[in-house]
Amino acid sequence: MHRARAILQAAFYDYPVDDLYSLIFGEEEDIGTEFIKGMGLAVSVRDEDTNMASCELDVSRLGLINGDIFGNCFDKVGEFAHDMFEAVGSLKIQQNHLLKWREITRLIGEELLTTAYVAKYNIRTGLCWQDVREVDCPWLDRALKDGVCDIHSHLNASYDAYLINWIGLMNQIAGKAYFFDRLEHPKDNPVVLRDYHFADLYSWCILAAKIRCCLYEYFVKGGKSEAWFMEQMEVFSELRHLTYYNGLVEDVENSLIEQREKSKSIYQRDDILDYAIEMNMTPALLDSPYAVLSGERRIMYSFLMAYYHGHFRHSKIIQLAYLYERIKTEFRKELVQTNRKTGLVNFKLYNSSKDSFSKQEKGLKDVMRAYGTQTSLYKPNCFLEGRFCIRDAEDFMKLQYDKGILSKKTLNQYNGRVKYVIHLTRKNILNTNRLEIGRRNAWKDEINAFLFMHDQCKSFTGIDFAGSELYTRPETAAGTIRYARNHGINQITYHVGEDYYDLLDGLRAIDECIRFCEMDENCRLGHAMAMGVNANNFYRQNDSEIVLPRQYYLDNLVWMIKKSQEEGLHLDVELEKWALAEAERVYGEIGYVGHFNMDQYYASMLMRGDDIFDRPGDGPVQRQLWAYLTNNRIIENGNMPITMKVRKDYIKQVVRIQKAICRLVADKSICVESNLTSNVLISNVMRYDAHPIVSFRKIKGRTQKELKVTLGTDDKGVFATSLHNEYALLVTSMMKKKRKQGYEAWYDQHVADFIKHLAENSMNYRFQEWQ
């Protein structure tokens, strides 16, 4: 790990808040030495290639600059930011440093680093810069100049849930214990350095709200003494011994009420989102959606200006400012995906947390939605296709995203650049009855609601099936999609091939989606990672063992054989014998009646997407299908896990089928929606340049049709990204791979042409308005 990044991660991400609090408020005389020891341990735990002694030696240099080790953490922030930015005065990241920047900001965010850079070098800019830094790459800007659309964006996860929720908390902290209780278990376990003291996240946020209030009074408003600051903080000296915080919350909330009332009086407005926002900024800045963040930035900017330029050196207040930033990062861990655990189950922990503080506060929810929409349209050449559930449709229709969040002024630049897609959610539990009558009826009701919305607003252009694909196969959606098509809805996108037990299972899901849902050139596939994931790497990462439900195992084996036959693929004789024997064995274990007949079983698989109530007959295929759909014993046995030992010839066959599925998608002119950061964090792809989007571009179908691919953000708030950032990360990773491998990788012009092609696809394959 890069040394500077390791220190920043240890200081602002790993160092336990409890231990930090004990140092600052405790009776330890030499807190610098204790802090250095803790930092050394934190660095060595994350960086396994470095021994403890060298870590402590490197960290000890923090205390050699001016003797204030906590202040020197802020010096490290400023130095690192200086190295990352393109030039003094620019807020663009150097392209060759983008991946370094991304690795640390994924953990601690961009706000502190950018604010430190602006303050340290006294850059004359407003406090309304974009929340995700752009990269200095002129030809990328040229490639996107003719228009680019984010066609895979879930609007309820597109806002900065961390910062906006944080600002809401820092302005009203009382009565929020319930919201913290609703958070899932900690997403990234802390490195425990000392004895752990009881103090939950809510209590730390109460402390942070008080520190923030004091920083604002001292550095922004002025006129307060250092003695006043410390007197205000005295009440927290025994925080770790408290079990109930009623008195503490009341004291802090009174301070916040006082600040809000002062702001209301000064600006003659009742709708003050943050007492720290300067509402008298220039109209252009006040119109910006990023003005919402300007109050938080203003406080830290004022502190860092005083610190960096030698106007302030009070060590205890510096320590409290550092503690404030560390608590912010601890809160951020709950809302932005920072851990490296893969799979949708992990992602859903973050996705469910993002609304924990805003569900009951409509004003804050409206701010978030407007922010997410406007920040997706930050440039005139940007377009958006936003997705949300039907229950949120009315709120989004009423949302005045064309008005400034703070200025309330109509901003015509957003008009006509937003279209809406309604997503129908799949359930997240294993089936007990595969007929799913209740879900099918619910989806039909949602289609009817969509048609009603479409009659009122033509910006509703299509439907999307989202949620866990592990538990709801494409067969369940087939009838709903037929119903939608019969009512004029032909623009459909389907999340598929993103989350799977076995790579072959993901490929089967894509094939079933195309077959059962009759996907064509008007449709798109969301993610479809299984089509391009490196099969050898996938099975190596899983130690050549796959755990999956018996029913999936049986279906995969049968489908592998029959799909290979249909596509004319080579199938090793020994592999086919093994697959048939395994299928027959598992068929019996699940409890199906009668002798295993692969042709009959596969015929029943092909009928799963049909409306079985309209299909006559009572033959063996129909009975096989009915047992699969309704027999509780078979369903229960089929859901039981089984472990598959992966053979080498099996992997080779998976690769052949991957290519066949890619040809199928290309032949049908179905567009694939790729989402770089989302897929890297959720799937088994660990590097940007290993993302399937890079291999998709090489695919040529049997009719020489090229596979159509786009790039989107998915959930840009949860992943702390932007559409421009997604393109920049892809460009940078591809170019770095070129430099590493020389002539065998991509030339700059190849990369430029590819990026332009992605942008053009995003405009050509976005859903259009229809009558």
Which sequence ranges carry the predicted segments?
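Metal-cofactor-binding active-site regions of metalloenzymes
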Residues: 1-771
